[in-house]
Swiss-Prot record:
GO terms for cellular component: extracellular region. This is Neuropeptide-like protein nlp-8. GO terms for biological process: neuropeptide signaling pathway; sleep. The keyword Signal applies. Residues 1-26 form the signal peptide. It comes from the Eukaryota. May be processed by convertase egl-3. It is found in: Secreted. Neuropeptide-like protein. Plays a role in behaviors associated with a sleep-like state induced by stress (SIS), acting in concert with the FARP (FMRFamide related) peptides, flp-13 and flp-24. Keywords: Neuropeptide, Secreted, Signal.
Amino acid sequence: MSQKLLPISPLQLLFLQCLLIGFTAAYPYLIFPASPSSGDSRRLVKRAFDRFDNSGVFSFGAKRFDRYDDETAYGYGFDNHIFKRSADPYRFMSVPTKKAFDRMDNSDFFGAKRKRSFDRMGGTEFGLMKRSAPESREQLINNLAESIITLRRAREAESSPESQRTIITYDD
């Protein structure tokens, strides 16, 4: 009556269970290696819970799925910056992401947010490059150029350490 219920011994079954637990615990490190030399894993599909960024009942103030190791603070070797898995920087690789303000020269004093607002402005003298410009277009363009030069000089004066102060008085 005594038949073997399992084709393997209980010790072998325990060993297989330990291997299975070890593989499932190492699975995130297998698909996202910590060092960039161990493989290019940036284009791999993320798991569902990796798409949530600090979401959940017990995640108040906690980074739940971040992996800490010696190389970087978040376990990824992506140029030493914080890599948020919920916002993959390679998701728009096939779509051109250059905007109009990206094509402006680097010597321009506008910051990126100012450039975005510069592009969105309409109905002002910044919209002079449209074809429906009025007759006094050259005068308005000259006024705009003068105001930009004045703004650049003001910015240079702000960035210079303790230069001459300008006092403006208004006479009534």
